[in-house]
Amino acid sequence: MGLHLYDTRRRRVRPFEPLRPGHVGVYVCGPTVQAAPHVGHIRTALPFDLLRRWLVQSGRSVTFVQNVTDIDDKIIINADRDGTSVWELATRQTRAFDDAYRTLGILPPTIQPRATGHIPEMIALVSALVEGGYAYASGGSVWFRVGAFADYGALSHQRPDAMQPSVEAEPGKADPRDFALWKAARPGEPFWSSPWGDGRPGWHLECSAMAGKYLGPVFDIHGGGLDLVFPHHENERAQTVCAATARPASNAASADSPGPGGGEPGGGEPSSGEMARYWMHVGLLTTGGTKMSKSLGNSVLVADALDAVRPQVLRYHLLSAHYRSTLEYSAEALAESTAAHDRVETFVRNALDILGGPGEAAALAADEVVSSVAGAQPTVAGARPVPVPGPGGESRLTPRRAWSDFTIAMDDDLAVGRALAALFGAVSQGNQVLSKAHSRELAGWVDVTRRMLNIFGLDPHEQWPTAGAEFRPALDGAMQVVLDLRSAARARRDYAEADAIRSRLAAAGLIVEDTPEGQRWHLA
């Protein structure tokens, strides 16, 4: 089957065919660092992390670019309100976003450009648009001429003549729909020199310039939240396609690129005149049925969310629905995700304990599922593909068949519902053979479970290393002494003492479980 992805521009799922075989260029619109990150930001970022991991697993190298918008009207307003500088606010909140992404296991971008570090590229892009007749200067600002782009509205599937005026209702615009490429300087605001006077870039311009610098005028995948389809991505596409057409052929996508309007009419495949071959958008995160956003005052900060649940659980919950669907965030939904995640994590932990650890499990699993998950962490561009089991044709569920089901689901536009069904099927089968110590069958099930968890960024052994790992041998030894004391209490039928020991350990964050194979412990 191969990977298929839904393309917003074409309104259908299409086979994924990168421009360069074996390599994928991805640009995702990153945060405007005006305030602390909320859960909605993570909801948008995680599906692209999942996609990236799957692309690498499938044998492709990935150049993943995610920008930081560090100059914007909202940043200026918030900095003024807080009595701080724009630069201090932007730097502080950029760190907060980086910390939140890292805490949630999101792989760092290959390139993370800041808008303010790319002003020359933005000025060059505006100059090309002005020279090509697609933009005009007025009062120190520069506006994109929407009427000059015949395909405007194609991404968001709107008719240009039915569109409302842009939010920038300022004098000097030739058409109410025109949007700002360059904004004339205002008193007290940051500015840069330009051929049109002092000013600063418009929001849409920033992403076009940075995507073009690092991925070229045409690249594979452009992503973001559903709320960015219009006007942000529509405007990005318009100015990028027109700039590529206006520039000399050596700087454009192709010497024989079509004029503004890009791909073939009537739903044909995107051509070299497009900005991105595939446009992907993540559905909204809601709370109480209403979109979560700062402007509505119902956003939940990542820091507050992590006071309620572990990072792994939050990551699981935000990935548990298909990326194009709406996902509800509530205490009840988080409780369900906690139970589901704990079931998987408990199986992996118990299985690895029985089998003697990841290395031993991998060796036992070699005959069962061809190769081990050990060392299969997705990495940045250039990573080698991980060996995977071949397609399964078994009538009964086996680790090989479970992986095949998982692969088919992920290749179908990241169908996480079916992928999670394959995961929980593997966990269920593994739990049934959990008592078979050093069983190849158990090793096979835990191996394939960890393969799937690895794609979701949730392998409890590999993806979430415990801080203070150098103290683990000492902790293991100390815990064995305590567990021996508890065993002695049970042997003399002093169950009150045994329960008291377990309760005191639980209060300290150390969970003891009694199993047919003996006592096991793990961190809460």
UniProtKB/Swiss-Prot annotation:
Binding site for ATP: 294
Pfam families: CysS_C, tRNA-synt_1e
Main location class: cytoplasm
CC cofactor note: Binds 1 zinc ion per subunit.
GO BP term, pick one: cysteinyl-tRNA aminoacylation
Catalytic activity: tRNA(Cys) + L-cysteine + ATP = L-cysteinyl-tRNA(Cys) + AMP + diphosphate
SMART domains named among the record's database cross-references: DALR_2
Positions with a binding annotation for Zn(2+): 29, 207, 232, 236
Enzyme class: ligase
SUPFAM superfamilies reported in the protein's UniProt record: Anticodon-binding domain of a subclass of class I aminoacyl-tRNA synthetases, Nucleotidylyl transferase
Subcellular location: Cytoplasm
InterPro entries (UniProt xref): Cys-tRNA-ligase, Cys-tRNA-synt_Ia_DALR, Cys-tRNA/MSH_ligase, CysS_C, Rossmann-like_a/b/a_fold, tRNA-synt_1_cat_dom, tRNAsynth_Ia_anticodon-bd
EC numbers: 6.1.1.16
Assembly with partners or alone: Monomer.
Family: Belongs to the class-I aminoacyl-tRNA synthetase family.
Name the record gives this protein: Cysteine--tRNA ligase
Species in which this protein is naturally found: Frankia casuarinae (strain DSM 45818 / CECT 9043 / HFP020203 / CcI3)
Name of the gene: cysS
